[in-house]
């Protein structure tokens, strides 16, 4: 478990009790445009995902942590995915519940995952693919000294996810 005393934010393994929160986050159509989703996940599929989340990152090439407060209430999720141990790199995915944004939770979580990646996995590169329209996420990663190394043009069709 990755832990910090600062504001009692913890990154912890997924638990079956996280299913409702995970279901709501993964099926929030307002977030799909940032995750390349276009269809909902079933509760059954997400329960299977939680059950299989104990696989080692070297086997599954990904790991998802629940971000929780001091009472173990989930606030969001942070992932390492596209894990490449030979090249010592991974991508980061981060989502904080809408009602908990702008409270520093994303920043604290990013600090913790960076420490975990460096000290436990010995990674030397973390990256994130962020839509330029996602200003708060771009700002967060810049604050943490991530460098914009490229810009894809017409890569993500965000309007495809707009509700009519």
Where are these regions (language model features)?
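A short, well-structured alpha-helix characteristic of acyl/acetyltransferase catalytic modules
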Residues: 1-47
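Acetyl-CoA-dependent GNAT
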Residues: 43-93, 97-99
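Conserved beta-strand-loop-alpha-helix junction that forms the acyl-donor binding cleft
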Residues: 128-138
